[in-house]
Curated annotation (Swiss-Prot):
Keywords: Ribonucleoprotein, Ribosomal protein, RNA-binding, rRNA-binding. This is Small ribosomal subunit protein bS6. Belongs to the bacterial ribosomal protein bS6 family. It comes from Verminephrobacter eiseniae (strain EF01-2). InterPro entries: Ribosomal_bS6, Ribosomal_bS6_CS, Ribosomal_bS6_sf, Ribosomal_S6_plastid/chlpt, Transl_elong_EF1B/ribsomal_bS6. The gene is rpsF.
Length: 141
């Protein structure tokens, strides 16, 4: 069996259906005797260019171990699923189980947003009235 990394771009209106789609694809892999090593949901992200008049897509990364028959079945399922805008399958030399560079970026962005939200709730922002009530700085002569 060979190791593969699959990147899927899902229609943004179908984001709620992503877990069901993943379970269906995992079932196809397991039925063929393969294994799923890693599943990463990168969420909705901006596309570099329009695809089917869409500027955003829901990204998924799946690392699997499967034989060629299972891969052919998966490729066929991706091709005829209208929710899958694009897919890319890359052959890997070994199983990849650690977080990808993209997932580390996603986690970093989530941490930054959470810390900003925490800072905004603890330190209230200065209102325009506060600036008007502040004493004037040194007069110019």
């Amino acid at each position: 069996m060979r190791h593969y990394e699959i990147i899927l771009l899902i229609h943004p209106d179908q984001s709620e259906q992503v877990p069901a789609m993943l379970e269906r694809y995992k079932g196809m892999i397991a039925a063929g005797g393969g294994k799923v090593h890693r599943v990463e949901d990168w969420g909705r992200r901006q596309l570099a260019y329009l695809i089917n008049k869409l500027s955003k897509a829901h990204y998924l990364c799946v690392n699997i171990e499967a034989d060629q028959a299972v891969m052919a079945e998966l490729e066929h399922a991706f091709k005829f699923n209208d929710a899958v805008l694009r897919h890319l399958t890359v052959h890997k030399k070994k199983a990849v189980t650690g977080p990808s560079a993209m997932m580390k970026t996603v986690e970093r962005e989530e941490f930054r947003k959470a810390s900003q939200a925490g800072n905004q709730t603890t330190a209230p922002a200065a209102s325009p009235a506060d600036h008007a009530a502040a004493p004037a700085s040194a007069d110019r002569s």
